[in-house]
């Protein structure tokens, strides 16, 4: 199929297209794509089956590379203002409970401290923007509001993707609105940003391959207004971001972006058991409300293809990772901005025939790399958790030995999750049809970043 239909704006004006790009799925990836296309003057429509953004804590951190991208879009300061305040420590703990001395304390800089380090660095070894703790239920409405400000972007919630057919000139997508009526939207290109269960990917017959259903956990969102202010509780750990519980249920507590909301992950059989786990971990009487509880599965999967004709995949529709390392949504943001400028170039007449071909070449290798990075990180956490022994909480020589052993292993292995700057910044596009290829090149590691001017690197 021809990549270049001419000037897409002319097609819209002539009535041949309803929109230049149809985006299916208004999560953070789809909304990032809509915002970037809109800022480039590309007419796009983004549809979402849900009636409104949901209050669900699917992600909780924009990494350094995503914040650099949002800075370029003029959104970084708005995201920081909406997220966790900059003075809160990002420390990580391994604990028995919140009222007992931590087994391990891994200190990490707050956003304010990280920004000061960035400002003081002049050798290119630091990102332009450090990370920002912000939950998806905060980020999504922010990106939606920004997209709605752009005259070239149409945002439609309560609009479900049903099917699509493509021809030489575009894509005809059938959608269904809340009242049950169907309509056809014609676009030059379509992008499926519709999550791991992606109806777009399934219709295209593109398979996900890798390791699926590795583990089942439940995730609950709690509101507890007093917990953050009460920390430290007795001899317990100080204020931080993650509290990993040394138990046989893979339990960990995460502070979300308001200091009043926390998520708890654990292997449980019921909502009531999840409440009990929260009380055991917090270990002090506090008023709380469990706002949601749902099961999720750990997957390490990659789509065979990121494109079929005029239809593309981005985000979780193309790759699924375990949240360890924070490479899910953040990888999708990279997909969105790589595809955005290429679609704009072709639609506006200054991009050549090979430009859109480069999207899959470039981004699928990063998806594959980040699936590997997630495997590396989750393997580290699995390794230290395997050191759990039932006597670990006992005041006895055997209990002390169990605590010391687990802490020593966690001190090595938990860092694989929390120190991933190389995976965030150090990737390089190899074999792209639009990048000059040189043999060799630097080796990029997951945990460390070395700045380079090698072609295809950040």
Q: Which ranges hold each PLM region?
A:
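Conserved mid-domain beta->alpha element of the FAD-binding
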Residues: 25-34, 143, 192, 290-376
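Core beta-strand elements of the Rossmann-like FAD/NAD(P) dinucleotide-binding domain
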Residues: 17-19, 179-189
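Active-site-adjacent segment of FAD-dependent monooxygenases/related oxidoreductases
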Residues: 55-58, 62-146, 245-246, 256
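A conserved short coil-to-beta-strand element within the FAD-binding core of flavoproteins
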Residues: 157-171
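Conserved FAD-binding catalytic core of PHBH/FMO-like flavoproteins
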Residues: 145, 189, 193-300
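Glycine-rich FAD pyrophosphate-binding loop
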Residues: 38-59
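Extreme N-terminal leader/targeting segments of oxidoreductases
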Residues: 1-22, 36-40
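C-terminal helical "tail/cap" subdomain of flavin- and related membrane-associated enzymes
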Residues: 344-457
């Amino acid at each position: 199929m021809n990549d270049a239909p001419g000037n897409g704006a002319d097609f819209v004006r002539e009535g041949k297209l309803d929109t230049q790009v149809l985006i299916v799925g208004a999560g953070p990836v789809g909304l990032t794509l809509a915002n970037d296309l809109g800022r480039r003057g590309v007419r796009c429509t983004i549809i979402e089956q849900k009636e409104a953004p949901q209050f669900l804590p699917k992600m909780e951190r924009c990494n350094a590379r995503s914040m650099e991208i949002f800075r370029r879009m003029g959104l970084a300061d708005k995201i920081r203002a909406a997220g966790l305040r900059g003075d809160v420590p990002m420390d990580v703990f391994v604990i028995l409970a919140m009222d007992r001395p931590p087994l391990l304390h891994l200190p990490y800089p707050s956003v304010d401290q990280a920004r000061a380090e960035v400002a003081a660095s002049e050798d290119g070894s630091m990102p332009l923007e450090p990370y920002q703790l912000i939950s998806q239920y905060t980020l999504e409405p922010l990106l939606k509001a920004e997209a709605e400000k752009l005259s070239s972007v149409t945002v439609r919630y309560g609009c479900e993707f049903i099917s699509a057919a493509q021809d030489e000139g575009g894509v005809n997508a059938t959608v269904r609105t809340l009242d049950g009526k169907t309509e056809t939207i014609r676009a030059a290109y379509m992008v499926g940003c519709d999550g791991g269960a992606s109806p777009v990917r399934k219709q295209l017959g593109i398979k996900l391959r890798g390791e699926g259903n590795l583990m089942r956990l439940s995730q609950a969102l709690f509101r507890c207004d007093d917990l953050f202010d009460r920390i430290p509780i007795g001899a317990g750990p100080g204020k931080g971001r993650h509290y990993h519980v040394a138990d046989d249920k893979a339990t960990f507590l995460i502070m979300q972006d308001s200091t009043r909301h926390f998520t708890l992950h654990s292997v449980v059989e019921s909502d009531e058991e999840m409440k009990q786990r929260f009380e055991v971990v917090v270990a002090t009487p506090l008023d709380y409300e469990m706002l949601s509880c749902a099961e999720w599965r750990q997957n390490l999967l990659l789509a065979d293809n990121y494109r079929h004709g005029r239809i593309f995949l981005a985000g979780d529709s193309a790759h699924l990772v375990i949240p360890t390392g924070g490479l899910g949504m953040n990888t999708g943001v990279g997909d969105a901005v790589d595809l955005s400028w290429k679609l704009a170039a072709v639609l506006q007449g200054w991009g050549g025939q090979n430009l859109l071909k480069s999207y899959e070449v470039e981004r699928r290798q990063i998806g594959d790399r980040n699936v590997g990075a997630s495997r590396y990180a989750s393997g580290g956490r699995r390794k230290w958790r395997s050191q759990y022994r039932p006597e670990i909480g006992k005041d006895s020589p055997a209990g002390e030995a169990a605590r010391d052993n687990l802490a020593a292993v966690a001190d090595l292995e938990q860092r694989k999750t929390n120190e991933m700057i190389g995976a965030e910044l150090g990737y390089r596009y190899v074999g792209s049809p639009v990048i000059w290829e040189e043999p060799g090149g630097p080796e990029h590691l997951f945990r460390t970043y070395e700045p380079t001017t090698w072609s295809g690197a950040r």
